Amino acid sequence: MREFEYYLFENFDADKESRNPLNPRNILGKETDALLSEIVNKEASYIECCENHGAQFVQKLVDGGVLRRSRNRLFFDSPIFLREDAAVLHAQISSRASSLADLLESKIPEIRGCCAGITNGFPVELNLYHILCGMVFDGCFFDYLYSKGALATSRQHPSGLDYLSVIYEKCGELRSFSDGLLCSYNRFVNAECSLQSFGDANGNRHDFYRFFRLMEQGRLPEKYRDVEVLLMNSFGGANKDILLDEVVSLIQTGWCAPAAMALLEAFGYAQNGRVCVPVFTPDYQSVIAEIEGIVEKSIGAAVVSTLLDLAGSLDITAVKHGVDKLEIANELYHIVFGSINEELVSRGIVAVPQRISGEGRYFKCIELYT
């Protein structure tokens, strides 16, 4: 049996929907691995899969957008990448990403000039890591690509939840794409504030988002027990709004509740009573927009062309199964911009995140929205 990794791009509140039985995080797992393996390894019929795995479970995956039924056949309905696809992905994407990085590098002096408007006390390279690699490539540039019809950012499911799902086979050949690239956000967020980290997906980061996901799954390591007790006693359990209100208070007034400071220090967002990571306030939105505009002008058309070409022509499983091209393009874009980010790191243009054993490579920051 093959094993798979499941990735979700959620357009819903992950905390509020954590116990929803139709949340794909509560469905996808070992049982799914067995069914997907059957479909990969042979032309499994719908009836046969229902007999082997249960009609109700098969229907959950159809409703969840993982599978699609056509007459008596089951096909993949989400972007899926198998070991057999790895060589094609490496051959087609690496050189294109390097060329795009070349185009962008010519604009770096102009982009660095924009960063003069960021006065948060941190080096330009670290601010650029968060702004260019994260906020632009994994944020507003996404909106640009969507506006050009180059990718999908949303899919409404019968459950009422809006998300995109992506599946990778667990194998060394795909690891550099599935969890090795700098293209992954963790955001503990509400309408006012975000405690976030950006990096690769090669481990469980020591941050608020991962802490809450592990707690929901009942997989919280022993090292977090004191933090869990503090959270339960001081903030009414997993009430993130109360905690994030304290973060806003700290940044705007210099003070927050001692329990909030203890949590921020426990997760490395503060040290000795002070915030120790970059803070991005609404005052910096004009700078971020200016940088995004430079990126758009320098590589926007080239990225659109690259995605539309790759999503429709690559000889990979998802294309063969007729998965929506714009959903395929969404994940291909993650691979492309993650590869560009790796180029920016290796060329010394942005700060270099150090690898932490069991956690991967990432940097943290705080962003205020109001």
Locate predicted features:
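N-terminal low-complexity, intrinsically disordered segments
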Residues: R2-S37, G54-S98, F235-L243, T370
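Extended alpha-helical scaffolding regions
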Residues: H90-N190
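Charged, amphipathic alpha-helical stretches
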Residues: R2-K30, I299, E327-L368
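Long, charged low-complexity terminal regions
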Residues: V248, W255-G268, V275-P278, G293-T306
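Short amphipathic alpha-helical interaction segments
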Residues: I47-S70, I251-A266
